[in-house]
Amino acid sequence: AGPAGAAGPDSVIHSTWIPLSMTLQVDANNDSSYTQSITALNITQEIIDSGVVLSYIENLFVNDGSIVDVSDYGGGYLDVTYNVGVINITSYFGDLSGAYYRYVIIPGSILATNSVLKGYTKQQLKSVDYATITKALGISTTKTTN
């Protein structure tokens, strides 16, 4: 057998752990936030329409190396939006530079066939803890940046 081919369009894709390097933004009302855009070329319109993108971040509040879903982080003070080819992260409670961030892209075809994930809505998947997602999708939990 030859070498394994590249991941196809129906494969789960996950990023390496990305150390955040946020930029201070100050609006006309003198309110500040910290932002970062991450290129994610595998986020296509099809993924946005029928798949799901999940985001996880190192929990800096407890300093124990735990990983949390971004929707649970900061009580709504962290906003992550997904557009074709890019993820935009905005922190309203401080600079998260240095925290490790990872995204997981799950195509709609995987959502329909994965025995663990089948039946979950997109909203339910966004609240599934990191350990469950990595186990269901066979993703390594080792925190490396390469």
Task: List PLM regions with ranges.
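Surface-exposed ligand/attachment interfaces on beta-rich extracellular proteins
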Residues: S21-D49, S91-G94
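Extracellular C-terminal loop/segment signatures of secreted glycoproteins
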Residues: V52-N83
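C-terminal partner/receptor-binding element of secreted or periplasmic proteins
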Residues: G98-N146
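Residues that flank catalytic or metal-binding motifs in active/ligand-binding sites
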Residues: D49-G51, A99
